[in-house]
Structure formats: C-alpha cells, structure tokens
Amino acid sequence: MPMKFEFSFSKSHRPAGGAAVLLQVAGAKEAAGAAVVDPEGVLAKAAKIGKFTGKALSTLDVIAPHGSPADRIVLLGLGDAGGVGDHDWLKAGGAAAAKLRSAEKITVFLDAPGLEVTGKAAADFALGMEMNAYGFESYKTRKSDDEPKAAQKPVKVTIVTGTVIAAKKAFMTAQAVGEGVFLARDLVNEPANVLGPVEFAARAKELERLGVDVEILTEREMKKLGMGALLGVAQGSSRPPRLVVMQWKGGKAKEKPVAFIGKGVVFDTGGISIKPASGMEEMKGDMGGAAAVTGLMHVLAARKAAVNAIGIIGLVENMPDGSAQRPGDIVTSMSGQTIEVINTDAEGRLVLGDALWYCNDRFKPQLMIDLATLTGAIMVALSNHYAGLFSNDDRLAEQLLAAGLATQERLWRMPLGKEYDKMIDSKFADMKNTGGRHGGSVTAAQFLKRFVKDTPWAHLDIAGTAMGSPTDEINQSWGSGFGVRLLDQLVRANYES
C-alpha cells in the first residue's frame, strides 16, 4: 500500500523518536538540524567514514547516536548550493520518501547551511515526497506480510524551516498540483474495462465540485455538429463516445481563454488495422493526453488560477467490429474537410481534428495546445525522455520549452513544413490520415495543423512520456501524469492576469 503523509511546518522541532532527515549542500561542514539530533557531533565522523560529501541525492543512513532525540538519521545531499533549483527540491523530497518506506514519523530539517531556502522549496520537497510515494494498487486484494505499518495510516512529517508562513501558503498550491498529477496517473493506470468513454466523462464531471463548468456531448450531439472523423473511430465499439468540455473561469470576464485539447482513446486495438498482441495491454493508456488535460483543469481550479481556461477531451474506443471503419473509407470532419482513412490505427488524429476545430469555432481561444499519445515514431526519435513539440507559433513554442525546463517535463521542438504537408495529400479526399512510416510524427502533426486555422497552436506528442517512461525520484508509476505540471507552469508564468 502506498505511503500517505500528513505534513506540518515548524520553525523549530525536537523529534521524539522516528526518523530525522538532515539536508546538506556539497562541501558544507554540517547539515541542517545537526545540533538538534547530533549533540555529540558523531555525524561528521560518520560522513567522513561513509564518504558522504553532500552530492546531489546521495544519502547516508545511520542509527541515531546516543543522546539523539531521533531513532534514525538520514543525511541527504543537495549538491552545489548555487545549482539547487525548484526541481531539485522535488527530487530531494522523492529521494527522502524512497529511503524512508518503513518510517512511522519523520522530521525534515530543511534549512541547509550555505543555502537560502524559500517557502516554495519547502512545499516542493513535500510534494516530491508525495509524488514518489504514489502507487496504484486499487485492484490488489493480497497484501504482503511485511508491509510496513506506516502504510496503514498517514505518516506524520514535520518540516523544520524558517519560512513557515510562506511554506504553508506554497504547500496549498503544491497540493493542488499533486492532486492533478495523481488524477492523471489514476486515469492512465485504470483498466479499460472499468474506464470507458462514459466513465471517463463521469470522472471529469466531478471537477464541478471545484467550480469547473463541465459539459458532456453525446453521440447524437456530435452527429449534429458533423464530427464524422471522431465518430468514425468510435463506430466499431459498443461503448458510445463522448466529448467533454471543461471551463474554468478564473480570469477577467472578456479575456480570451487558453485551450487544452486531449486525445482520449480509452483503449486502442488499432481497429481493423489491428495491433500485434504483444504489448497491446498498454493501449489502455492511449488516453494519456485526455488524462493530462483533466488533471490540469483540476490544478487550475483547485489553486484558483487567475485565467480563463478550456479543457476539451475526445473520448472513444477503437475496436474491430462488423461496423468498424475500414482502410479506404472516407469521412467528413466537422471542418468540412474530407479524410481518407488509410490506417485505422492512425485514429488519434481523427479524434483531435474534430476536437480542435470545435474548440476554435466555439471559443475563439488565444491559443490551443493539444496533448496526445499520438505516434510510435516520436518514441523512435526521442525515446522516453522528451515529448515532441510541434507549433505554428514561435512565441508559444519558446514558452513551452521554458516550462519544460522549469518542470523537467522536457520537450524537443520538431519541424513542420510544406514538404511534410504534401505527404498527407490524398488521391480521393482532401487528405489522408497517414503519410507512411517516414517522418510519422511530423506528418501526424501536419494533419492536425489543418484544423487550427491561424490560431497559435502547439501539439505535444507524449507517446513516450505519458506511460512506461523510466522511473525516477518523483515517479514510480507506469502512468506518469506527464503534462500536468508542464502546462500549469506555462499558465502560471505567462497567462494569469
């Protein structure tokens, strides 16, 4: 069972047993809190013997010496004082949580000598602990005999810092971010037999308790709008599609909204162009873009962001059936443009095409950003470490790249151009839904570009980062929640009034 934490912040605290975490920068003579938990100065000798130098994320775990009010002491390195950024505090918190799986109470001495510690740093450290401890075990009925008692109830964590008031305020925002990330992770991790389009829409509807206006369009309503591209993907499944429109109105009344659009294929068999059996179970995560948009809308509402934001998610299931669309079919999108379906496994762009057009036509946003686990080609290019960024607007692209660096949800800008656009021209329709294997992620983006007009737009291909990416200090989950922190940072830095 994943650990749960109950945090408090204090200017001073003397532990009464439990574990104490002492932070130290590289080259410092002592760690934060050493005078409290190590009155005899034993830690310095232990650090020398253990060759602990304060290197980033390095640890030294010792039984508390005689006279210490703690039972266990963990020295945790932060690295060079001049290089400690926001993300480093998250990772440090994650490293602490990973080290203290069996702890029943924890005291963290945060104010490392030689380092200026802010309230946000304290909040980020706490969020890092929570992000590391996240787990998805809803369907496990057998618990291991050696499961720590700490997992049964919240572990009390006292963070000792001189910035208590600022830390408490920052932690309220950090908690909102964490909730959004965990919502996205939960949605991606959920099995497809439980989370269909209707059930996903119901989860999104729950955001109304935070003040989000949620509207759910049915199949009949989408037919009236002419969403033939999205509906073509859904027609092979017995589970009806949904289009969910989420509105957060935290900005000025007449201020144009920022819009986020997510691909929500709750399970992707590939349709008639069926995928190989090996690994197909992972296609329950083909709604990672929709999960990220839903998580983001939770964050914006929970922290009362001063922005008008739209979240739109197209929810379908792509199944082979007697009524499923075939290669060679031609569908008419909401835009009026016709599309020849070459490969039914290139379905996400069909869903997004209608969703993008609907968003632009109805809301006239100042920008649109779509997120999608769209192509395997982006994983060939970037592996699991970067998401692909495609954009028709340099300013928006630069803002996204900066947000990626700040959150370490990193993006790499990919090309767009007329040469690639020609690759999706069709002999029989206005366009075809795939341009072949070469440049597959680029031609997919070019397809989407045909549905955005002149609105500043960016497409994030998160196929390699939304699920199955390498674990690290702040993510031990298969579904990562990628994109939630990235886009919250984008909004926070550029679009809040």
From Swiss-Prot:
EC number, UniProt record: 3.4.11.1, 3.4.11.10
Molecular-function annotations in GO: manganese ion binding; metalloaminopeptidase activity
Active-site residues annotated for this sequence: K275, R349
Residues where Mn(2+) 2 binds: K263, D268, D286, E347
Chief place of localization: cytoplasm
Superkingdom to which the source organism belongs: Bacteria
Organism classification: Bacteria, Pseudomonadati, Pseudomonadota, Alphaproteobacteria, Hyphomicrobiales
Protein name per Swiss-Prot or TrEMBL: Probable cytosol aminopeptidase
